[in-house]
Amino acid sequence: MKPFLRSQLERYAQRLQELDFLLSREDIMADMQQYRSISREHAEVTQVAGRYARYQQREADLAGAREMLEDPDMAEMAQEEIHAAETELVQLEDELQRLLLPKDPDDERNAFIEIRAGTGGDESALFAGDLARMYTRYAATVGWKVEVMSANESEIGGYKEVVLRIEGQPGTGPSGSGVYGALKFESGGHRVQRVPATETQGRIHTSACTVAVMPEPDEHQAITLNPADLRIDTFRASGAGGQHINKTDSAVRVVHLPTGIVAECQDGRSQHSNKAKALQVLQARIQEKERSERAAKEAALRKGLIGSGDRSDRIRTYNFPQGRLTDHRINLTLYKLLAIMEGDLGEVLQALQHAREAELLAELGLE
């Protein structure tokens, strides 16, 4: 093990004692926000300290087995123990490296997924519907709940724009991530190549959608919106093709005047619920704008493999004639497109997470 990594790990036992003491204090227990924060850190530190203790134990086992080699009667058993210990030590070191990677505090949060039809007209809107269905199906496979926050339907099906809220327990995504941590690398441009249902000559068309994944702010993170900065419009909710689905102005559009960011909702039964949902999405969009601006600055300094998550980044191609999905950021190609569109997205999400981990390990000099 590299000395840098070992020195980092040595601190965890001491930090665990400090956290145990803090959690026993009455003033900490009385402050729920601080107590939750310390409890979260305690769980993370306990995991690292436990795995490092196991690593040290196996190091001691290995040293003992090597001493046993000098005894002819014990040599065979010693060789078996050496092989087992060396194998486990490699696995433990890899696990410890990943546990020490910087954590995105938003990874455990629920997420909003915003899908917009781009170039390609009706076919793009249909593909936006396919993407919404893919994420909804994937969410169902891991036990997450999906709620449509707003939807602007196309006349022939699909969506011009749709916003989904996905809720799930922390640690239920690939590699133990939460909802946002699992889906955040979906942000960017998604291109589809296929023969549209309306195409009579059998020609392949190319169209595109953009996806933005935003963490849902919790009550402590949520920004305070000044009512003076908001313009709230109400209008009649309508379905595809402009058919009115009610006769009251229950749909709500909220404009954040300083940034020009807009959110609207017309899916709820009342103006009150639509306004609440629109404000939720608006807050997430404002925070995402700030986050993406920070990420763009960081990306200018460090060209990351996964990218900044900007909408303009073309990240993936879905080629239906070939049954192929290609993620251009990590040169991943899978020939199981129909299964992926039915929600079998885990392999793609995990590959992206592993690529990001490899980037971080390289930055820390651990690879």
UniProtKB/Swiss-Prot annotation:
SUPFAM superfamilies in the record: Release factor
GO CC annotations, alphabetized: cytoplasm
Residue(s) carrying N5-methylglutamine: Q243
Gene3D superfamilies, alphabetized: 3.30.160.20, 3.30.70.1660, 6.10.140.1950
Record's keyword annotation contains Cell inner membrane: no
Post-translational modification note: Methylated by PrmC. Methylation increases the termination efficiency of RF1.
Main localisation: cytoplasm
Keywords: Cytoplasm, Methylation, Protein biosynthesis
Pfam families according to UniProt: PCRF (PF03462), RF-1 (PF00472)
Cysteines paired by S-S bonds: none
Keyword flag Secreted: no
A GO MF label: translation release factor activity, codon specific
Compartments where located: Cytoplasm
Coiled coil: none
InterPro entries for the chain: PCRF, Pep_chain_release_fac_I, Pep_chain_release_fac_I_sf, Prokaryotic/Mito_RF, RF-1
PROSITE patterns xrefs: RF_PROK_I
Family: Belongs to the prokaryotic/mitochondrial release factor family.
Function, in words: Peptide chain release factor 1 directs the termination of translation in response to the peptide chain termination codons UAG and UAA.
Protein name per its UniProtKB record: Peptide chain release factor 1
